[in-house]
Amino acid sequence: MASKAKTGRDDEATSAVELTEATESAVARTDGDSTTDTASKLGHHSFLSRLYTGTGAFEVVGRRRLWFGVSGAIVAVAIASIVFRGFTFGIDFKGGTTVSFPRGSTQVAQVEDVYYRALGSEPQSVVIVGAGASATVQIRSETLTSDQTAKLRDALFEAFGPKGTDGQPSKQAISDSAVSETWGGQITKKAVIALVVFLVLVALYITVRYERYMTISAITAMLFDLTVTAGVYSLVGFEVTPATVIGLLTILGFSLYDTVIVFDKVEENTHGFQHTTRRTFAEQANLAINQTFMRSINTSLIGVLPVLALMLVAVWLLGVGTLKDLALVQLIGIIIGTYSSIFFATPLLVTLRERTELVRNHTRRVLKRRNSGSPAGSEDASTDGGEQPAAADEQSLVGITQASSQSAPRAAQGSSKPAPGARPVRPVGTRRPTGKRNAGRR
């Protein structure tokens, strides 16, 4: 009987040791292959799925040299166009003459033809302002002399016979006015003052709320947006009007909003980063970009829809050139602002932060721990959210190992509490009860 009891204890101890060894080998495999497992798990998800969930669809910060090169090329083209081509300034900046009269059934092409036959040159612009019975034809041209203005009014009256307030054809229905070039200059001066005040307030807020490196990155991104938008106007030849100047100020607000969204997530991900070795600062910033990527895209799409509606109303329904100029600069600014907030501002922030001693030391610690082959190092090898299941599995296996290693000595010592499902073990040194009352006294 004693030999059977000893055999039972040996079997349980052997089972516990085998379970511990199997669990430890599973943990070792998990530690050695965590990066491979993470990559295989991410491989099962499509690009759009990873893009939507923010689990590392884009490597932006890691390729920031590429994006800096692209951004630098864009800025270089914009500056070259501004320097060599210049801008197409509207009448408000160059000065000129405006002639208007009730539309009636007049078409733009007819007005342009009458203007050319009367003065021998093309008008700067001919637009239909308003709709219905109150619609008017507005002609903008270079500064005309009084004789040229009178000649043009006569030609327009003979061709279209615009009606006055009494419903009868009248030359008084045709009005003209001179626009001074100083008016556009005054608007530009006020816009520059507003821009400087805006940048100062933005710099103060971001410095107090976040940090100075984010301030430098955000201000640089806004200057990038202004330069590229102005370059597009110069390259394509869009007319620069006071509405364009006002639109440039409005896109700064959108660009800043989109940039702050990403920066807020970066600040959240990197809070206390120096106390952990899971990811480097650059990897945390790249994760923040991916986590806010869809939010930025959705914000841009929602911002573009009313701008497109404004352009539709301005061009096809009302024919208001001012609204068209305002909507056009906003459309260009939204596209450029979305690009800069993702591919320029955050990579620039990472570049500035990596010049600090704190971030450099932390990056060296993370890389050193990864290269050492420790479980934490292999866990840190991945830089996206998809590694969390592997880490959870590893922790579960470690817990099983600890429990098994503790149960093995208890089994070897003959614990009075057998494991569930284990074969009952008879205590050593005891005899089978006989069922008789005084059997033990014999």
Curated annotation (Swiss-Prot):
Residues 1-39, 366-442 are annotated as: Disordered. It is found in: Cell membrane. GO terms for molecular function: protein-transporting ATPase activity. PANTHER family: PROTEIN TRANSLOCASE SUBUNIT SECF, PROTEIN-EXPORT MEMBRANE PROTEIN SEC. The keyword Transmembrane helix applies. It is a multi-pass membrane protein. This is Protein translocase subunit SecF. Forms a complex with SecD. Part of the essential Sec protein translocation apparatus which comprises SecA, SecYEG and auxiliary proteins SecDF. Other proteins may also be involved. Part of the Sec protein translocase complex. Interacts with the SecYEG preprotein conducting channel. SecDF uses the proton motive force (PMF) to complete protein translocation after the ATP-dependent function of SecA. Belongs to the SecD/SecF family. SecF subfamily. Keywords: Cell membrane, Membrane, Protein transport, Translocation, Transmembrane, Transmembrane helix, Transport. The chain crosses the membrane at residues 67-87, 187-207, 218-238, 243-263, 301-321, 331-351. InterPro entries: SecD/SecF_arch_bac, SecD/SecF_bac, SecD/SecF_CS, SecD_SecF_C, SecD_SecF_C_bact, SecF_bac.
